[in-house]
Structure formats: structure tokens, C-alpha cells
Amino acid sequence: MLTAENIQLNCYETVYILKSDLNEDKTLSIINDYKSMLTNGGAKNIVLQHRGRRHLSYTINDYHDGIYVQVNYEGNGQLVKSFEKSLRFDDNIIRYLTNKQKRNIKKDS
């Protein structure tokens, strides 16, 4: 039986790219909204890195530049599924990718 004491949390890394024509206030608002979404969903040890504007290797939706954001966190598969669904339907996100890291953390409390 699964209880809160023995739930396995997996480590994930999500990188998403925002449209380059967003102003700084809108960019920070989107980043903070997604961070709070992870926190409310039960993610632990959230590390957010705002990588800034970078040139894309190839054009995506007529954009040559994008604003990169990297988020590392611990959570379960359901959290990742809902997080990716939100990213998929956000018009300000032009691309995202989530990778599961090898290390597992056992939740103690």
C-alpha cells in the first residue's frame, strides 16, 4: 500500500523556450506562474534557471531567437503530465522538453 512515507519521487529536468518578443515583465510572470504550478502540484527541490535569450539552431514558428528556462525538480509522473499539458497549450511557449534524471529520492516525511 502506498502511503506518503514511501512514495518515490523522481528527478526531472524541463527546459522550455518562450517567444522572444515577450517583454521582461510578461516573461517573469510566466516563469513565476509555472514555478507556483509545480509547487502547488507537490514538486520538491525546485531549481529554476533563467538562461536568457538565445539564438535557435533552426527556426521554430518563424522565431529565430527564444528565451530559455530550465527547471529541475522532484515529483511524480502525474505532476509532469499536468505540467507538460499546461506548457503544450500556452501560446507563449514555442518548445519544451522534459527529461527524467537517473537519481531517485525516497520521500521520508
UniProtKB/Swiss-Prot annotation:
| GO cellular component terms, semicolon-separated | chloroplast; ribonucleoprotein complex; ribosome
Question: Is-annotated flag, keyword Metal-binding?
Answer: no
Q: Where in the cell is it found?
A: Plastid, Chloroplast
Q: Which InterPro entries match?
A: Ribosomal_bS6 (IPR000529), Ribosomal_bS6_CS (IPR020815), Ribosomal_bS6_sf (IPR035980), Ribosomal_S6_plastid/chlpt (IPR020814), Transl_elong_EF1B/ribsomal_bS6 (IPR014717)
A GO BP entry = translation
Question: Keyword RNA-binding, does the record have it?
Answer: yes
Molecular function terms in GO for this entry?
small ribosomal subunit rRNA binding; structural constituent of ribosome
- Coiled-coil stretches are none
Name the SUPFAM superfamilies on file: Ribosomal protein S6
**Principal localization?**
plastid
Q: Which UniProt keywords apply?
A: Chloroplast, Plastid, Ribonucleoprotein, Ribosomal protein, RNA-binding, rRNA-binding
Entry superkingdom? Eukaryota
Q: Give the PANTHER family listed for this entry.
A: MITOCHONDRIAL 28S RIBOSOMAL PROTEIN S6, SMALL RIBOSOMAL SUBUNIT PROTEIN BS6M
The family this protein is said to belong to: Belongs to the bacterial ribosomal protein bS6 family.
Task: Output the NCBIfam families linked to this UniProt entry.
Answer: S6
Q: Tell me, what does this protein do in biology? A: Binds together with bS18 to 16S ribosomal RNA.
Q: What is this protein called?
A: Small ribosomal subunit protein bS6c
Species annotation = Pyropia yezoensis
